[in-house]
Amino acid sequence: MIPITTPVGNFKVWTKRFGTNPKIKVLLLHGGPAMTHEYMECFETFFQREGFEFYEYDQLGSYYSDQPTDEKLWNIDRFVDEVEQVRKAIHADKENFYVLGNSWGGILAMEYALKYQQNLKGLIVANMMASAPEYVKYAEVLSKQMKPEVLAEVRAIEAKKDYANPRYTELLFPNYYAQHICRLKEWPDALNRSLKHVNSTVYTLMQGPSELGMSSDARLAKWDIKNRLHEIATPTLMIGARYDTMDPKAMEEQSKLVQKGRYLYCPNGSHLAMWDDQKVFMDGVIKFIKDVDTKSFN
């Protein structure tokens, strides 16, 4: 457990180190907010095979870390500061520190790069657009692919804010999540554990009750750093996927908006392409890290 200082007190966050490699240290940032590291266990086989040093990590508020209840903690700047404290604790620096963020973890990774890129060697943003309003617009596009009667029932439940209604999940799972979150017929145990352990209080406060866009009153709803991506000079990999909840064309555009970007497209993947288009995803991530490490990235 790593001690973390915050404006409302001191807490501890859970991390687990794999391997020892002074040249490559990768910190994995999970999504949610307030999911867990568990769904990112898929990196273990691939990164260990390459000899990378990497860290699974539960952000503050997540299941394996402390879960304070002060709502002042749940904002981007505070999470960015937490990542910087974790970096120091794992003795990573601009010569070896790679951040890989998926979904909300991608928001955190981009925001970290904007504030602390002097400490960063490589940035990997998996399946996260740089604008929450644009993401919400794309969710509208995808939601219209659902059967009209299904969408009508989903919207009716949302209008009543009856999110605890089991019917809400019953509708979203086969009609949206199985298409756009993870397309494997059977969801991996690691992903199911992560879902079971989500801190729904933090998740709902920051993003809303489901993966179908964001609530207009969620703390992340107006988040948009697209016009700041040009400030990021760290070598960056943006990952998009055909069936993702995030527009793959936006992910490609983001790779051109940063100063040194590369785009990885997963033609069979969704939001968790690390699982459902695994070979393409992992091969691309590993190549990026090796290219940056050997100074052959361009």
Curated annotation (Swiss-Prot):
Residues 26-277 form the AB hydrolase-1 domain. It holds the Pfam family Abhydrolase_1. Maximum activity at 42 degrees Celsius. Stable at temperatures up to 44 degrees Celsius, showing 50% of activity after incubation at this temperature for 15 minutes (at pH 8.0). Optimum pH 8.0. Its EC number is 3.4.11.5. Transmembrane segments: none annotated. The active site is at 103 (nucleophile), 244, 271 (proton donor). It comes from the Bacteria. It is an enzyme of class 3 (hydrolase). GO terms for biological process: proteolysis. One of its GO terms (molecular function) is aminopeptidase activity. InterPro entries: AB_hydrolase_1, AB_hydrolase_fold, AB_hydrolase_sf, Peptidase_S33, Pro_imino_pep. Signal peptide: none annotated. SUPFAM superfamilies: alpha/beta-Hydrolases. It catalyses: Release of N-terminal proline from a peptide. Keywords: Aminopeptidase, Hydrolase, Protease. Monomer. PANTHER family: MONOACYLGLYCEROL LIPASE. NCBIfam families: pro_imino_pep_2. Releases the N-terminal proline from various substrates. Cleaves specifically Pro-betaNA and small peptides containing proline at the amino terminal. No activity against hydroxyproline-betaNA. Belongs to the peptidase S33 family. This is Proline iminopeptidase. It comes from Elizabethkingia meningoseptica.
